UniProtKB/Swiss-Prot annotation:
It comes from Halalkalibacterium halodurans (strain ATCC BAA-125 / DSM 18197 / FERM 7344 / JCM 9153 / C-125). Its main location: cytoplasm. The lineage of its organism: Bacteria, Bacillati, Bacillota, Bacilli, Bacillales. HAMAP family: GalP_UDP_trans. This is Galactose-1-phosphate uridylyltransferase. InterPro entries: GalP_uridyl_Trfase_II (IPR000766), GalP_uridyl_Trfase_II_CS (IPR023425), GalP_Utransf_C (IPR005850), GalP_Utransf_N (IPR005849).
C-alpha cells in the first residue's frame, strides 16, 4: 500500500469517527496527529475528503493493519499484534473516560436506563472494543426440549492462540498490573502480548450496596448487551448477603437487565474466581421464561413468594415487592443449603473443612416484583465422576466438558469452536451408506461415534436438507442432559422427594 493509500485510510478512519460522534470537527487535526504518532508517521500527503459507508471500523482498520504489516510497524503479522495496534488506533480517537461517564448518566436521567445502556453498547461496538466482525462468526440456534427452547451458540469469536505471541510472552517479566482482566486499571491500558490492549475500553461507575462497582460490556458478547459488573476492588468471588443486596439494587437501577453471579467454588464456578463480578444484560434467557411448577411459603418471610422452577437444574425462585425482605429470604435459603446434607441424594456439604454447597444467584424484575433465582450447586467429586458429580458426565464430554457457569445455567450453551467443523464432518458421515467407516476416517469426530450412530438409528430419513437441523436439535437434547447432570436434585420421583426434604428445612 502506497503513502497516498495510507493517507486515504487514515482520513477514512477520521471520517468514520466523526460520523459516529467519537470526535467533533474541532478534534480532527489533533486526532489525525495522534493516529500519525501511533503509526510512526511524520506527515501525510493531503487527500480530498473521503466518503465512508461503514457501520463499524474494522474494514478501515484492516487496511491500515495491512499497511502496518508491509511497513514494519508490526512485530509479526498475527492476530495478537494486529489487535494491539488497532486498539491503540481506536484509543487515539476517544475522549477522556469522564466524558463517556458524563454522557451516560445525562442520558440515564433524561431518557432512562434502557436508552443509556443501549447507546453505551452501540458505543462499545463502534470503538471496536466489541469486535462485531468476530462476533458475527458465532453460530446460534434454539432447540426444543421439555424445559422450553434452550439456546445454543458455537463460539467462533475468540481468536486461536498465537504461537509467536506465546513464545514472546515467555521472555516477558512477570507483571501483576493490571492484576486481572476485570480490574478497573485496564481502562486505557496499552496491553502486552499476554494481556489485551484496552485503550478503547470505557466503564461506567455504579454504586451497589454503598460500594463502588463498575459496568462494561463483554468483548465476546454471547447475548444482547452482555454486561460485566465488577467490583472496584480486586477481591475474590464470594456469595454472601451483600451479593443479594447488590444484585437486587442493580435491578432497581437497571430494571430492563437481569444480573447474576457465578458460584464461588471451583468446578461449579466461572473461569474467573479471583475478582468479584456479575454478568447481566438485556436478554430473556430460557430459565427466566420457565414457570414455577410448585410454590411454597417460608414462614419467616410471609411477603415472599417462593417456588421450584421447572428446570433441569435445581432452582428455588423467590419473588417480592420488598427488596430488603427478599435479601433476607435469599440469605436464609443460601445458609440452609450451605449446611444441608442428604445421603440418599448423594449430597454432602463438607469434606472435612472443605465446603461443597453453594449457589448461582440470578436477579431480575418481573413487572413491579423483584425476583431471585437461587440455583443450588455442589462441587463434590468421586472416583466415578472425577470432574464433578454434579457436572457434565463422561458420556457428554464429546459436546462439552467445561464448567457449567452462569450463562449455561440460565439455558444458553456456549460450545467450543471445534464443533462447527465436527458437525460438518458428522453430517457427511450420517449421509453416507457406512457412517462408521467415514467416522473412522476423521480422528476429530471419533469421540462422537456412539452419539452419531444413535442419531442415525432414530432418524431413518436423513438427507442434505435436514441433517444439520437434526444434528443441532440433538445437541440441544445433549445440553438439556448436561444441565440435568449439574442439577443436585434429579428430575425423578426420588429427586422431587429429596428437593421437598430440603424445602421443609426452610421452615424449621
Amino acid at each position: 500500500m502506497s503513502q497516498s493509500s495510507i493517507a486515504i485510510q487514515i482520513e477514512a478512519l477520521l471520517t468514520y469517527a466523526l460520523q459516529h460522534g467519537l470526535i467533533t470537527k474541532w478534534d480532527i487535526d489533533a486526532s489525525r496527529n495522534r493516529v500519525l504518532d501511533v503509526l510512526d508517521l511524520d506527515e501525510l500527503e493531503p487527500v480530498e475528503q473521503v466518503d465512508v459507508e461503514c457501520e463499524m471500523p474494522y474494514p478501515i482498520l484492516e487496511n491500515i493493519l495491512d499497511w502496518a504489516a508491509e511497513n514494519g510497524r508490526l512485530e509479526a503479522n498475527t492476530v495478537t499484534y494486529r489487535d494491539l495496534l488497532d486498539t491503540k488506533l481506536m484509543g487515539a480517537l476517544l475522549g477522556q473516560p469522564s466524558e463517556t461517564i458524563r454522557t451516560f448518566y445525562e442520558r440515564y436521567e433524561q431518557q432512562g436506563p434502557e436508552e443509556a445502556t443501549k447507546v453505551f453498547y452501540d458505543f462499545s461496538k463502534q470503538v471496536h472494543y466489541i469486535r462485531t466482525d468476530r462476533i458475527a462468526k458465532n453460530e446460534h440456534w434454539f432447540s426444543e426440549t421439555p424445559y422450553g427452547q434452550l439456546e445454543i451458540t458455537i463460539n467462533l469469536s475468540k481468536p486461536e492462540k498465537d504461537p509467536k505471541a506465546i513464545a514472546q510472552a515467555k521472555h516477558l517479566q512477570a507483571s501483576s498490573y493490571p492484576k486481572c482482566l476485570l480490574c478497573k486499571e485496564n481502562v486505557g491500558y496499552r496491553g502486552r502480548v499476554n494481556h489485551p490492549a484496552r485503550q478503547n475500553l470505557r466503564v461506567i461507575p455504579v454504586e451497589l450496596n454503598q460500594e463502588q462497582w463498575y459496568m462494561q460490556f463483554s468483548p465476546y458478547v454471547y447475548y444482547n448487551e452482555h454486561a460485566i459488573v465488577f467490583s472496584g476492588e480486586h477481591v475474590p468471588m464470594k456469595i454472601s448477603t451483600e451479593t443479594f443486596a447488590r444484585l437486587l439494587e442493580f435491578t432497581e437501577k437497571f430494571p430492563h437487565y437481569f444480573i447474576g453471579s457465578n458460584a464461588d467454588l471451583p468446578i461449579v464456578g466461572g473461569s474467573i474466581l479471583s475478582h468479584d463480578h456479575f454478568q447481566g444484560g438485556n436478554h430473556a434467557f430460557p430459565m427466566a421464561k420457565a414457570s414455577m411448577e410448585k410454590t411454597f411459603s417460608i414462614s419467616r418471610f410471609p411477603s415472599v413468594i417462593a417456588g421450584i422452577v421447572k428446570w433441569p437444574m435445581s432452582v428455588v425462585r423467590l419473588q417480592g415487592m420488598d427488596r430488603s425482605e427478599l435479601v433476607k429470604a435469599a440469605d436464609h435459603v443460601y445458609h440452609a443449603w450451605q449446611a444441608y446434607g442428604d445421603e440418599a441424594a448423594d449430597i454432602y456439604p463438607f469434606t472435612g473443612d472443605t465446603p461443597h454447597n453453594t449457589i448461582t444467584p440470578i436477579a431480575r424484575r418481573r413487572g413491579e416484583l423483584f425476583e431471585l433465582d437461587l440455583v443450588l450447586r455442589n462441587n463434590r467429586t468421586s472416583k466415578e465422576h472425577p470432574d464433578g458429580i454434579f457436572h457434565p458426565h463422561q458420556e457428554v464430554h464429546h459436546i462439552k466438558k467445561e464448567n457449567i457457569g452462569l450463562i449455561e445455567v440460565m439455558g444458553l450453551a456456549v460450545l467450543p469452536g471445534r464443533l462447527k467443523e465436527e458437525l460438518e464432518l458428522l453430517a457427511e458421515a450420517l449421509l453416507s451408506s457406512d457412517p462408521r467407516q467415514v467416522i473412522a476416517r476423521y480422528e476429530q469426530i471419533q469421540k462422537h461415534e456412539a452419539w452419531a450412530l444413535a442419531i442415525k438409528e432414530r432418524h431413518a430419513h436423513l438427507h442434505d436438507s435436514n441433517v444439520m437441523d437434526i444434528l443441532r436439535d440433538e445437541i440441544g437434547k445433549v445440553f438439556a442432559t448436561i444441565l440435568a447432570h449439574a442439577g443436585v436434585f434429579k428430575r425423578t420421583g426420588e429427586g422431587a422427594a429429596a428437593f421437598d426434604r430440603f424445602i421443609s428445612t426452610l421452615n424449621q
